[in-house]
Design a protein with these regions (language model features):
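Bacterial N-terminal signal peptides
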Residues: 7-16
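Sec/Tat signal peptide C-region and signal peptidase I cleavage site
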Residues: 17-21
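Bacterial N-terminal signal peptides that target proteins for export
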Residues: 1-7
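Secretory-pathway ectodomains
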Residues: 22-620
């Protein structure tokens, strides 16, 4: 079983009460000698642009902004920032940089903005007042610090090694307003991100902000609350709230209730809920759809179900060996101009089926046949007068396993559980991976007018990959050993290729690439022409790949077997490897795994190992 390992986050916060430090005296002078060494040396087959070093060991954060202009490395007590040439911009100790002497920071995280961003620090003090501070990443100057905000994380949280993965349950950054919502016991406070100034406070909204939508035209925010897991005792009397707020002064324009409980994913801690605005209506996706009037918050219609699809196995975090949950088992709603299609879950028989509802009134227009034996129904598509349904497929699994880890890989499990410790001991270690379960797998085509079954494929024995749909005419899909092409209008199978003849192992995923479909497999890649299914190439040079990324015009594969983290750059025209980078350290983006970060255009990879940073060019 392949896995994607993610070090659980150590994150951090902010507060109010603006203050300014005597920056010139407190900031360590950036050392000129730490300029990036130009290279030309090869990393795999990639070219190293430069190598440089942070002024600290970068045990907490080691990341780069979207275009590679700023490279940030932090430990518990200090930060070091390099420019795109690998030269030091600034270095400093938090205690000297902050007026409130924020020091050992249990949680730290970055928020990137165009041309810079913020570094947030949270110093949880078990016997004193918690301290928060915000630094300007471009200069190292303190923007503000505060001791006004308490109980943003549980008391006694331990400082753990980890990666920069986002914000706390009690703090939500609102990018459109460059501001933060900070949840306290009796109120929510909106804070200016640059100055720490309190803009407004309301006691009519309680809990954390699970999801929000900002209406720039009216300067209004619609947001939904949830109960922070680790701080639940602070939010007694909690109730579900969906509110519209005047972003200027915090006035509550309307307050509605909703059905269901917002859960957080086991490892990522993302809220499992979505919000969309369609015309004058707000659509909430939480165990089905709930639809509200945007003007007054009144519920108009709903189509919901009882959801236990996340599942749970193993034991509790206390005394057990593993806890596991499944996600992304049901497709999100599919919207058209006048209708919405929803994958529904049968209450008693656990069947799955599709409903079509009128977007305006919610009237049920049709319900498809009920499918038994399928654990998941992860994707639906509208192509012409057909609704294409993927029955079966891969699911996302998130796990916490009680394992022995070294001090360098003892990721911040305390952020989730409060447990964790030193090197060479057992800790709760997080994993995220895609997995195929034994279930019914097939392609199902429904008539859009009636919901009746137009055609279905034969049952796939092994598994079913996601679909590639080409020019609204053809559908391509794999089942592990075979690769198929279907005519969408009629369901005619116009080719059936023996993928196992490519000698690259079972199909795991499919990639849409120009006039080809590239099949990512257990031992390598195979590509097939869309026109006739003929094989273009097959390469088994890369084994154990369990994930792929399309970044800009570049494609990357990832291998995480045996606690490794290797990123391969791939030329999809011929399947050849451009180069590879194997992580030898911590930090990096959680998206790409320990020790690795990649720019938004996919042109550069940054590799981190303690103090050392290497910038690598993808295309020579």
């Amino acid at each position: 079983m392949k896995k994607i390992t993610i070090a659980v986050m150590s994150i951090c916060l902010m507060g109010t009460l603006p203050a300014s430090a005597q920056f010139g005296k407190l900031l360590d002078k950036a050392k000129e000698k730490v300029g990036g060494k130009s290279a030309g040396k090869k990393s795999g087959d990639f070219t190293t642009v430069w190598e440089s070093e942070f002024e600290n060991k970068a045990t907490r954060i080691a990341v780069v902004d979207g275009d590679g202009s700023y490279v940030v490395g932090t430990d518990d007590n200090s930060a070091s920032v390099l420019d795109k040439e690998g030269k030091a911009i600034w270095n400093g100790d938090y205690k000297k940089l902050t007026t409130n002497k924020t020091n050992k920071s249990e949680f730290q995280y970055t928020v990137w903005k165009k041309g810079g961003g913020y570094l947030f620090l949270f110093d949880e003090r078990s016997l004193g007042t918690d301290r928060v501070a915000c630094l300007d990443i471009t200069t190292g100057k303190e923007l503000w610090s505060s001791e006004a905000y308490q109980n943003l994380i549980p008391k006694g949280t331990k400082a753990e090694e980890g990666t920069d993965q986002g914000e706390l349950e009690t703090v939500k950054y609102i990018d459109e307003l460059d501001a933060f919502f900070i949840s306290q016991k009796a109120s929510v406070i909106m804070v200016n991100a640059k100055t720490g100034e309190k803009i407004w406070e309301t006691n009519r909204f309680k809990g954390g902000v699970g999801k929000y939508i900002y209406d720039a035209k009216r300067n209004e925010i619609i947001m939904v609350n949830f109960k922070p897991t680790a701080l639940g005792a602070l939010f007694a009397g909690f109730k579900n709230q969906l509110v519209k707020i005047n972003a200027s002064n915090g006035d509550i324009l309307w307050d509605a209730s909703f059905l269901g409980t917002i859960e957080k994913e086991l490892v990522t801690r993302r809220a499992i809920i979505d919000l969309w605005v369609k015309g004058d209506k707000l659509f909430m996706y939480l165990d089905g759809l709930q639809v509200f009037n945007m003007a007054n918050g009144q519920k108009i219609w709903s189509a919901t179900y009882e959801n236990d699809m996340q599942g749970s196995s193993g034991n509790s975090l206390i005394g057990g060996k593993k806890r596991s949950k499944m996600y992304k088992t049901l497709a999100p709603p599919l919207f058209t101009d006048n209708a919405v299609y929803i994958v529904m879950l049968g209450t008693r028989d656990r069947t799955k089926y599709v409903e079509k509802h009128d977007l305006e009134s919610g009237k049920l227009l049709w319900a498809s046949e009920k499918i038994t034996g399928a654990l998941c129904m992860p994707h639906i598509y509208k192509v012409g007068n057909k609704i294409l349904v993927q029955v079966g497929g891969k699911i996302e699994v998130q796990e916490l396993r009680y394992e022995e880890v070294s001090s360098s890989s003892g990721a911040a499990v305390g952020a989730l559980t409060g447990f964790g410790g030193g090197g060479g001991t057992k800790q709760w270690v997080p994993y995220i991976f895609w997995d195929y379960k034994d279930q019914k797998n097939s392609v199902l085509s429904l008539d859009d007018a009636t919901g009746l079954t137009a055609w279905r494929s034969e049952r796939f024995d092994k598994r079913i990959t996601d679909f590639v749909i080409h020019e609204s005419k053809t559908l391509f899909v794999g089942d592990g050993d075979q690769f198929y092409g279907y005519d969408i209008a009629s369901g005619t199978q116009f080719f059936d290729v023996k993928h196992n003849d490519a000698n690259v192992g079972k199909a795991k995923d499919v990639i849409d690439f120009d006039d080809k479909v590239v099949v990512l497999s257990e031992k390598g890649l195979a590509a097939y022409n869309k026109k006739d299914g003929s094989r273009v190439y097959a390469t088994e040079k890369i084994k154990g790949v369990d994930y792929f990324y399309a970044i800009g015009n570049n494609y990357f594969l990832r291998d995480q077997r045996n606690s490794k983290n290797i990123i391969y750059g791939i030329d999809m025209t011929n399947g050849e490897t451009k180069g590879s980078v194997q992580s030898k350290g911590k930090g990096g983006s959680p998206k790409y795994g320990d020790g690795i970060d990649i720019t938004e255009d996919g042109e550069y990879i940054f590799a981190f190992k303690g103090r050392k940073v290497e910038k690598i060019k993808v295309n020579n």
